[in-house]
């Protein structure tokens, strides 16, 4: 213990005994007087000098210990060495003295401000008073004046760069500017971090008991004797419990009754009665929804005129169609309160408990029953399933094909400027005719008496006699063409008819029909005397009909609505189908009028085909849709098939079997079963049965044309890969 510590605290002197005759004590015995500043008052006054410190006394070895002659050697008086007033005031010694310690230098309180002498008291006590407390002398400490209005507060907020770090101290009533360390502390606390920047919460843990076997034990204290000797206190407790059980003072616990506190009131009720009550429940009919006449701004036709209003007022309330007069208001906030609200609520209550209710039996329909039951494809045979033959010979795209009425011969036109005739059964190319340009369309005359093929080449339509089959039919065809007698008066026609001569005639060419524009399509009438051509142009002469026997041409339309894509003759009736980009128009050629306009719901029609019965039509489009039209049913598609992934190029019906096919740029031919019934009340049955693949995609083109065999369930397809394929 340091010297002088007990002296400062005012306790008794308990220093170690020192020799009586030390140098300092010897000076007292010799009669040497003490220092003037060491008076008796300073020794035993019991007061501490605020100007001195115990630490100075410990470091200063000039302090003296005085032994009272009347005391024992253990009671030693410690007398600190003091300087005189004159010595303390001298400027020479002022530099040697330590600096005067400030009042709050060693103050460790961080909750109270140095300027706040009020203390740590609730400031709510002085909330309504002009002062915030009292100082040490008992005088009031008035609150600082805060005369800033909102404008000055706003200007201070805009101009003072330290406004964001200024806070109001409730204890002193002043604004305090936070230091950087305090701002950093606030930010860390807001983020949920520790206030001390140097504190590391993730210090490496020191596991005292490690996995390593220690040589010496952690604690080597011998076990207590009580750890292996039975406890006498527990023995006494057990004996008391045994005695109490024998005497019957302690009873065993009764088993808890698991019966539920709350029970079901209707547990024993007859279930049939419950079901009957539920079955008899008839829900109340719902209120009808308000109509346009109940709007605050109804349409003009719902507002009554003056005559209608007078007639409504004269009618009895039971005879009125509306129980109110429709009114119009400019805005919703101008609508007044509804005067008939309570009356309508009362009538609704009367209806709920007075009116009898009727039960409507609800029919539960299985959703799967609504789906039509389609037959299996194997029950719909025959239809083509496998690829039987490939006709090779063309060097470019095979754009069009056509089959003879007998089904023995096949003709194809290609971009290599050639027309080839094939034998269907053997795949042999019987004849090849080279023309001036690419063949866009080709059609075999459906009349079995005439052996004639029409092909579109650039701006011309050429009629070819292939000379295949019966020679009598071939010669009769030539006589039919050469026996033409021109009329006496020449009629101006939109085309020019020219006969082939020389080498062209020997190769099979018979007639040239030259047009003013490029020809896109040619198609024959069922009788074989008329054929129509399509000129893809925006003019009025997009469609022309030619008559072979009289060599006459005419434009059936004065004006074409839209760009014509395909045309087709009805197989039995005088109807003419004209397909534009989005519509299919049906014209009656005898009456010269528009009969129907079919809405395809497609972006661009590419091809059409008519059912042999003539009442149904299929339409293919470039947006991968195939639409089936039942013309007796509606002008909209009966069914739209989206089986192909790319644009459809051609569609075709079989003449005798219930089959139709479609060819697409995805190099596939899809064959579907399309049964049309004689019963007008029964819808057609459409079932996809087979996807035929074999063509290769060339220049983003796949199958370009599809044609059925006239008598067999076979289908021909021509593709961009230069081949013709037969599927049987």
Swiss-Prot record:
Organism encoding this protein: Xenopus laevis (African clawed frog)
Disulphide-bonded residues: none
Keyword Transcription regulation recorded: no
Pfam families the UniProt entry points to: BOP1NT (PF08145), WD40 (PF00400)
WD-type repeats, residues: 393-432, 434-474, 514-556, 559-597, 600-639, 643-682, 698-728
UniProt key word Nucleus: yes
Biological function: Component of the PeBoW complex, which is required for maturation of 28S and 5.8S ribosomal RNAs and formation of the 60S ribosome.
Disordered, as annotated region: 1-114
Family to which this protein belongs: Belongs to the WD repeat BOP1/ERB1 family.
One Gene Ontology molecular-function label: ribonucleoprotein complex binding
Keywords assigned: Nucleus, Repeat, Ribosome biogenesis, rRNA processing, WD repeat
Cellular component per GO, a single term: preribosome, large subunit precursor
Classification via InterPro entries: BOP1/Erb1, BOP1_N_dom, WD40/YVTN_repeat-like_dom_sf, WD40_repeat_CS, WD40_repeat_dom_sf, WD40_rpt
Protein name: Ribosome biogenesis protein bop1-B
Cellular localization per UniProt: Nucleus, Nucleolus; Nucleus, Nucleoplasm
Biased composition, class Acidic residues, residue ranges: 50-67
First-listed, main subcellular location of the protein, grouped into a coarse class: nucleus
SUPFAM superfamilies named among the record's database cross-references: WD40 repeat-like (SSF50978)
HAMAP family named in the record: BOP1
Oligomer status and interactors: Component of the PeBoW complex, composed of bop1, pes1 and wdr12. The complex is held together by bop1, which interacts with pes1 via its N-terminal domain and with wdr12 via a high-affinity interaction between the seven-bladed beta-propeller domains of the 2 proteins. The PeBoW complex associates with the 66S pre-ribosome.
